[in-house]
Amino acid sequence: MKLAFYGLWEDEVAKLSALQRQYIFESVRSREIFSAKNASLCECCDGVSLYGNDTLGEETMKTLASYGVKFLSVRDEETTVDYEAAKRYNIRVCRSTFPPDAVAEFTLMLALVALRKYKRAIWLQQVNDYSIESLKGEILAQKKIGVVGEGEAVKRLAEILKGIGCAVQIHGENDGGSLDDFYAESEVIIYPAKLKNPEKYRVDRDALAKMREGVVLVNTASGDIFDVPSIIEGVESKKIGVLAMDVFKGERGIYHENKTEDILQNRDMAYLRQFPNVILTQHMGFYTAYSMETLVERSVESLVQLIRGGESEYEVK
């Protein structure tokens, strides 16, 4: 059995080596994401594990099939996969997931530090200003919290929020309740999980108009949910009181890269970052030691199970 791994993180190497000894397979490894230039690495491989691609569409499936690949595991929740194309080329696809606690806890942290003006506190400390008059914060447990989405991360976040005394309402994608009422009632609106229908929940001018003045928005799901020009207008007009985002539209090529010697080409990101009530983190909510080990472990186990003629709970059918 031979497996190919693309977009491999340094964090995954030790765990992958242990799994290789456990399941006894050969491996081909690349730090680069899968592309036409390095596709030949997967020739004669029984399965392929990918991370970091924006989309895996018709051409990708055609290329994989041309090298004899029958089984594919995707380790990145941000990657859009054309499952119908995969079926046309007889490729079975699994998606590794990480435990919900990482994103749920990080989302809570973002909401807390945003409300307690921690960004401003850090700035002031850099110039030895330890006054606190400008740092008066708010208590999250006194806010009406709205959580958008479904799945384990949403459930776990709701559990944690309720545990500290928050009043929480969840608007799932299959709910029939009024989204307008949800917007009007929520003082803090949190997006912790990628949505199947992001257009329905897109935060644009119309959506913001239905929200409370000074609404707190927290997004650890996907940059595509927020219409950035509308978000900028909302911050400038103070319609948005606090904005915290671990994701950003157009983040690929910036987040998870060292850009200390570069000028950022994403002007919206650079502009928003300078506001004292805006917190932007580099898509790190998932990034824990346990999450990284779990991603590669579930990826390998899924491929091995399918190659050996079994089933995987992570297969997308």
Where are these regions (language model features)?
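Rossmann-fold NAD(P) dinucleotide-binding segment
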Residues: 56-68, 198-217
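Rossmann-like dinucleotide-binding domain for NAD(H)/NADP(H)
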Residues: 214, 223-317
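Oxidoreductase and adenylate-handling cofactor-binding alpha/beta cores
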Residues: 104-123, 162-166, 300-305, 309-310
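Short glycine-/small-residue-rich Rossmann-like dinucleotide-binding loops
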Residues: 52-53, 192-195, 221-222, 248-249
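N-terminal glycine-/charge-rich "phosphate-binding" loop or analogous flexible N-terminal tail
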Residues: 1-45, 255
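Phosphate/diphosphate ligand-binding glycine-rich loop within oxidoreductases
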Residues: 44-122
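Rossmann-like dinucleotide/phosphate-binding beta-alpha-beta segment
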Residues: 133-213
